[in-house]
Structure formats: C-alpha cells, structure tokens
A protein has these predicted regions:
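Boundary at the C-terminal end of the N-terminal hydrophobic targeting segment
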Residues: 20, 25-29
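Bacterial N-terminal signal peptides that target proteins for export
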Residues: 1-9
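Extended, low-polarity segments enriched in aliphatic/aromatic residues
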Residues: 29, 33-341
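Bacterial N-terminal signal peptides
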Residues: 9-17
Length: 341
C-alpha cells in the first residue's frame, strides 16, 4: 500500500486525592446558548498520577463497579509524545479497566493487529492493563446524530460495546489532518475501526483503504465527518462516560506520526469534563492564551486545517456546548483563557 503524504498522515493503583471545597476556584463563565448552562471543565496544573485521579474524581461520575474501558492512543512506533503508562497506570488500575484501541487506516506500526500489539508492548501498556484492539475480530455500525450532513452511521470496533463505563483519555496536541487532536478526535477516528476511519476520512465515500486516501473530500467536510462520528459515540455512551485531556508534550503533530515535530509549547495541565465539546474548546482556548511565540506553529496548524470548526459542527449537532466555566482544582485561580496575540 502506498503510504499517505504528510496531509494524509494528517503495579501501582493510587488512592484518589481528596478534594476540599477551598481547592476549587471557578473562572468567569462564558456566555451559553439560550436555555443551556455552560459546561464545567475542571483544571489542574498537576500532570501526575495524583493530578489525573483528582481530575477524574472531580467529575462526580464514578465508574467503579462497571466494566470499564480507557480509550487512549497507544502511539506510533518512533513517537514518544503519547500518554505514558507511568502517568495513566494508577487511574486505569484503580478502575480495573481495560485499555482499548483500534487499528489505523494508514501504513505504519499499528495498521495490522500483530504489529500493533508489538507497538503496544514496546510502549509499555501491557504492563499496566489488558489491552484490547477493538476491531481485531469485528466491527459494527452505530447511528450518527440525525442532523448529520455526511455520515449516517459510524463504523466502530465491535469490542467497544463490551463495556459499560468509558474513560475517554486524550492527549491534546496538533494533528496533521485535523488541526488538533483531543476528545472529539479520540471519539471519532480513535474509536472507529480501520474501515470506519476510511469512512470518516472520505466523508462517507468509501470504507476501504487505501481508496480513502484517493477520495479525500474538502477539508471542511472531513472535519464535520469527525464531529458526526464523535457524536455517534457520545450518544452511544450516554451518561456512562467521562472525558479527560492531558496537555503535555504538545507537538503540532499527532501521536500517530512516527516522526513528530518537537514540542514548542510548555506543558499546560490536565482538564476534565462531562462534555467533550467544552473540553476541546477549553484546550483550544488555552493554546491561544499561551505565549504566541511558542504556540504560533500550533495555531497555524489548527487554522490551516480548519480544526476549530469541529467544535462548531459538534455543538450544532447538539451533543455538547462550546460554552464552559473553567474550575481550578489547585486552590487558586484557573488559568486565563483570554487570547494573547
């Protein structure tokens, strides 16, 4: 198979940290659509197992007692920016969760199950949990939001439906094709089977690889297709899911890139919400609120690829809101989300 171009590649469970009321500080809420309250997005500067546990607990949606899955990106061979096992292991193990992934749609170390399993082992994930490749044996369609423009159904790894509790654990960074990768990208491309990824990348024209790389739609249609696929997964999970994003090792390139650009931005923190759209919006806002010298490349990447449009389309589909209030878990004011130019 021809490899796609740069455009195509677009034993330690810890107790949860106790949260005191004086450790929670709220930023001024952003304006919400009429009749809809802003979503709460929790924030901590503490990028550590304790910080991750604190963010999870703050959400107030315990998944203990359910059959839990933690959806991450295991990272392409050669990439070292993915969320490391030593960071996420304590949370995964405290929930007795499985890690889940799907095979990719491009030539690399994760397109086929045997090579993917080798990469998973090399990146250390087998040491912290059982890892399930969701589309190893089967795939299935789930309906997209009724007002979707490009996709009627999202084709996902069938093993996703074996679970009753979902932690969508995202590494926020840039992305060659999507502009940025966060919760919505993890929900859409991340949960889709190889054929489902082809469907999203082609905006519904084909489920086949490598055909999808020869049938790329206008960029706006691709971005909207990701939003629609993410909506299908959000609707399927309902109130059984939590969403957490880690803003560290923030390259302009995705963890699916085996030779990513070196991160230029400083690490930011961990964010968590019950609303994946608000979560991604807060992460994007924090990029624009950061030093414009170090965030310039990521801003350019997001804008060139129409990345923020996924937020508009997702909100329009009705499964999330861009309006949020940022709540600090560190006992101080949350970081400013005001744009800095």
């Amino acid at each position: 198979m021809n490899k796609p171009s740069l455009r195509l590649l677009a034993s330690f469970a810890l107790p949860f940290a106790a949260l005191s009321q004086d450790a929670v500080t709220t930023a001024t809420p952003k304006a919400a659509p009429a009749g809809k309250a802003p979503a709460v997005v929790y924030f901590t500067h503490d990028i550590s197992p304790d910080g991750l546990a604190k963010a999870y607990k703050a959400l107030g949606r315990p998944l203990e007692g359910r059959k839990v899955t933690v959806k991450i990106s295991t990272g392409e061979a050669g990439n070292n920016h993915y969320l490391k096992p030593e960071l996420i292991g304590p949370l995964v193990q405290s929930l007795k969760g499985d890690i889940v992934e799907c095979n990719t749609a491009y030539g690399g170390s994760r397109q086929e199950t045997p090579k993917h399993r080798k990469t998973i082992e090399e990146h250390g994930f087998n040491a912290i949990a059982k890892v399930v490749i969701m589309d190893e044996f089967d795939q299935l369609d789930i309906p997209c939001p009724s007002s979707s423009s490009h996709l009627q159904k999202d084709l996902i790894g069938a093993a996703f439906t074996n679970y009753s509790g979902f932690v969508i654990l995202n590494h926020f960074k840039g992305h060659q094709m999507g502009g940025f990768g966060g919760a919505l990208k993890n929900l859409s491309i991340g949960v889709a089977s190889t054929s489902g990824k082809a469907r999203i990348h082609s905006a519904g024209k084909t489920d086949k690889t490598p055909d999808c790389w020869r049938m790329l739609p206008p960029q706006k249609d691709f971005i909207e297709s990701m939003a629609e696929a993410a909506g299908a997964v959000v609707d399927y999970m309902g109130d059984r899911a939590v969403y957490i994003s880690v803003m560290n090792n923030i390259s302009i390139d995705c963890d699916c890139n085996g030779h990513p650009a070196k991160p230029e931005m400083a690490d930011v923190g961990i964010l968590a919400s019950l609303d994946p759209v608000a979560l991604d919006k807060a992460c994007v806002d924090l990029v624009y609120a950061s030093d414009p010298k170090t965030s310039a490349s990521l801003r350019k990447r997001m804008e060139k690829q129409l990345g923020p449009h996924i937020l508009d389309h997702a909100e329009g589909l009705g499964y999330g809101t861009k309006s949020y209030k940022l709540v600090s878990l560190d006992g101080n004011e949350p970081p400013s989300t005001k744009r800095v130019d």
